[in-house]
UniProtKB/Swiss-Prot annotation:
(6S)-5,6,7,8-tetrahydrofolate binds at residues 117-120. This is Methionyl-tRNA formyltransferase. Attaches a formyl group to the free amino group of methionyl-tRNA(fMet). The formyl group appears to play a dual role in the initiator identity of N-formylmethionyl-tRNA by promoting its recognition by IF2 and preventing the misappropriation of this tRNA by the elongation apparatus. The gene is fmt. It catalyses: L-methionyl-tRNA(fMet) + (6R)-10-formyltetrahydrofolate = N-formyl-L-methionyl-tRNA(fMet) + (6S)-5,6,7,8-tetrahydrofolate + H(+). It is an enzyme of class 2 (transferase).
Amino acid sequence: MRLIFAGTPEFARVALAQLHAGGHEIALVLTQPDRPAGRGMKLQASAVKQFALDHGLALAQPRSLRLDGKYPEDAAAAREALVAAQADAMVVAAYGLILPQWVLDVPARGCFNIHASLLPRWRGAAPIHRAIEAGDAQTGVTIMQMDAGLDTGAMLQAQAIPIGAGDTTGSLHDRLAELGAQLMLQVLAQAVHGSLQPVAQAAQGVTYAPKIEKHEAAIDWTQPAAVIAQRIRAFNPFPGATAVLNGETLKIWLADVAPGVPPVSKEFGSILAVAPVGIEVVAMKSIVNITQLQRPGGKRLGVAEFLRGFDLQPGMVFERHGS
């Protein structure tokens, strides 16, 4: 099938690579403009752009696709490229730009989207983060026929996978990226044979997954340990949960729930115990056990290695959220 592909991060690159390897003709790739990244804040190409360059694929990086928006010249050039591609369908995966109706109307068979949740749960920008943050037992991938709404299109394929107790957004992302690519290959095969069976999304069970904001990463020790541990895993690898101790902001990468209940005399955020296997911290009627953390400018370290260069003692107190 002759395709336009629109995507930006690694999640999308996995799908593009499998579509390319699967024999589909990639007539055009859309990805977001290069962004400053890293310590030097140098412009970096997206994972999708790098794949397109490596494989000689036609590429466009419009700042917007809205003909009446801030960059109408970008949108007009993109429309010319999309129409010229004469694609059978467009595959969209974590592109990051709003697709106006004119874009949806260009491909002969419309636009198919890879969404990393079991719709209608977790419509929006951050479905993987929000599923872990909420403590969901499972998530999955939905392939949908795109319409003008926010992840409201008819479902063409869906498959669930469990969320493990130790899953982070990073680990779950990798499994969902592979699953999404496989499901999209199935959907395209069905499209070729005219056997697609669209199913409308349920009106019940709709939840939204708004974009992750950095301020959300500050740990609130007044919450239960299970909630804190879920948020730590949800914000790994981005933006990284944070906690402030003696004026220094630490990144907390991994944690679980320790057995027992803290003494009522201990304030939230108090360090109860320090051992090579974990740092126990007081939460709401429960105890968080931190197992991996990082100092500013340092590396992620397990507790045993971290303690070699940082003196942590029982009785120290992490600052309260918002204090």
